[in-house]
Swiss-Prot record:
GO CC field: cytoplasm
Active site residues according to the UniProt entry: 107
Gene Ontology biological process terms from the UniProt entry: Mo-molybdopterin cofactor biosynthetic process
Gene name of this polypeptide: fdhD
Keywords: Cytoplasm, Molybdenum cofactor biosynthesis
Name this protein carries in UniProt: Sulfur carrier protein FdhD
Homology family: Belongs to the FdhD family.
Keyword Cytoplasm: yes
Its job: Required for formate dehydrogenase (FDH) activity. Acts as a sulfur carrier protein that transfers sulfur from IscS to the molybdenum cofactor prior to its insertion into FDH.
Domain of life: Bacteria
Gene Ontology molecular function: any one: sulfur carrier activity
Principal subcellular localization: cytoplasm
Pfam families registered for this protein in UniProt: FdhD-NarQ (PF02634)
Coiled coil: none
């Protein structure tokens, strides 16, 4: 039986000049330790659902695997909080290459500040997906409506893999990076072609979020929040359209505005 993704607790709410006791729903935090070929690799603090997708997506994002068939055996013991991954390759992982984040310039045309493993795994988008303004806003609305966990707790981030007119998969997590890793794992497990897909996201587009999207292989990210300057620089270099502040009836296009399609 899986862990509960929410927990109930009695709280006191201040409203209209008085404290009133009521029951509230909170998002559950779950530490999951990932063992790779018998060695401890990482502990992810996450929402306890879609855990196989999370682990596989995280390992792909870190460059440990590229395809699901590189995993020989996968098991999760939720009672202990462990995921066990046996790879087809028995080559010993150099953990320092993955856990030590080294910031520096990438080889090539002076790319900006990639982490060591990101140089190997970030993909430059080949096909630039186009989308109408109406569908940009529709996808954001649809994602927000679909997240029951967010509506119950207000304590999670949402991410959706989409075509240009509909949601394909939506994942929620207390960690914004985890939500994206769950989508990556979903794509690998179900062998979803991603070159013509985009990601709709509830949080800020930081450089790490942008890199997660690049590793998945999509060519557009739509967020209801703001991007950072470094994320925009990376998006230009990786050929990814970035849209922020997608709310109500408006949004900002930060890179590749030519892909907004007017009828």
């Amino acid at each position: 039986m899986g862990k509960n993704i929410t927990t109930s607790r009695k709280i006191f709410r201040y409203d209209n000049g008085e404290l009133v006791q009521q029951e509230d729903q909170m998002a559950t935090e779950f530490p999951l330790t990932v063992m790779v070929n018998g060695e401890e690799f990482v502990t992810l603090v996450c929402s306890p659902d879609s855990l196989e997708e999370l682990v596989i997506g995280f390992l792909a994002s870190e460059g440990v695997i590229r395809f699901k068939n590189e995993i020989k055996r996968f098991t999760i013991d939720e009672s202990l909080g462990f995921a066990y991954v046996d790879l087809v390759s028995t080559k010993k992982l150099q953990l320092k290459d993955y856990t030590k984040r080294v910031i520096g310039s990438c080889c090539g045309k002076g790319r900006h500040f990639y982490f060591q493993q990101d140089v190997k795994t970030a993909k430059t988008a080949i096909d630039g997906v186009t989308i109408t303004p109406e569908n940009c806003l529709k996808l954001m609305r649809d994602m927000q409506k679909s997240s029951k966990l967010f509506h119950h707790t207000g304590g999670v981030h949402n991410a959706a893999l989409c075509s240009t007119d509909k949601l394909i998969a939506v994942r929620s997590d207390i960690g914004r990076h985890n939500a994206l890793d769950k989508l990556y794992g979903y794509c690998l497990l179900h062998q979803v072609p991603v070159r013509d897909k985009l990601i709709v996201f509830s949080g800020r587009i930081s450089s790490e979020v942008l890199l997660k999207a690049a590793k998945i292989g999509v060519s557009a990210v739509i967020s209801k929040s703001a991007p950072t300057e470094l994320a925009i620089q990376m998006a230009e270099e990786l050929n990814i359209m970035t849209i922020g502040f997608a709310r109500n009836r408006s949004f900002n296009v930060y890179t590749h505005h030519e892909r907004i399609q007017f009828s």
